[in-house]
C-alpha cells in the first residue's frame, strides 16, 4: 500500500490526504497557498477544521468572527504557529495578506464549539525523548482543549535525531506533512504493523506527506538536517490518545541515559 505523496507548490488548495485513499477513513489534509488579496472560501460540512498558518499572514473570518494579520512566521522552523479552529457546519474565508501557506486539517465531528483563534501562547510546548531521539513538540489543538475529534501539532527533530521513538503506535489514523532545513535535506519514515502486513519505508523531503492508517511510525532526520512535521490525528469523539511501544523495542524506554 502506498502511503506517500509529494506536494508540488501551486496557488489555491491542494488535497493531499483524504478518506478512501491510502487506507484512511477519517483524516482529511491539504495545503492552501494564497497570494496577497486572493481568497479561499469553504463550508466545513460534517468536519471540524484546524487551519495552521505555516508561513506568512492572512485574514480569516468565520461565524461572525474575523481575525486580521494572522500568522507571521517566515517558515515553520521559526517558532510556534498561529492557528484557527472552525467547527462543523460552518463557513470560513481566508484572504492572503501577502503570500501565505496554511495547513488545512479536518476530521468528522459534531462540534458545537465556536470558531476560535489559537495563538502561539496557547500552544503547549513539550520536550520529548532523550539522547538521539529527542524532539520538540508544539501541541496546537486536541484532547478536548480546542476540538472534538482532531488532534493537531508540530514536531521538530534535530539533525540525526529520531522521532516517534521508541517505535510506537496510537491506534488512530494520522498524517504527517514534512519540511526539512536546509531545504535540500531528507529523512526516513517507516510505517509497520506487528504482523508486517504493513511495512513501508519512505524518503521524506520538504513538502512530502505520509499517511499512517495504523501501526508504528518511527522516523529519523539525516545528519546535518532538521525535520519539521505537522501531525494530524482523528481521535473520534472520545479523544483518547495512548502511545503503545513496539514490544521488541520497549526496552529502550527504560534503558539508562547515555
Residue positions per predicted region:
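Non-transmembrane, aqueous-exposed alpha-helical and coiled segments at domain scale
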Residues: 4-5
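A short glycine-rich, His/Asp/Glu-containing loop-to-beta-strand
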Residues: 9-41, 131-175, 186
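Conserved metal-binding segment of the jelly-roll/cupin
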Residues: 77-97, 107, 203-224, 233
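Double-stranded beta-helix
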Residues: 100-138, 192-193, 230-258
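Extended, compositionally biased flexible segments
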Residues: 29-95
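Glycine- and acidic-residue-biased ligand/ion/polar-headgroup-sensing regions
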Residues: 45-68, 86, 171-208, 220
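Short glycine/proline-enriched turns and hinge-like loops at secondary-structure junctions
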Residues: 44-45, 96-98, 169-170, 222-225
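Short, structured patches in soluble enzyme cores that scaffold and shape functional sites
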Residues: 88, 96, 104-108, 141-142, ...
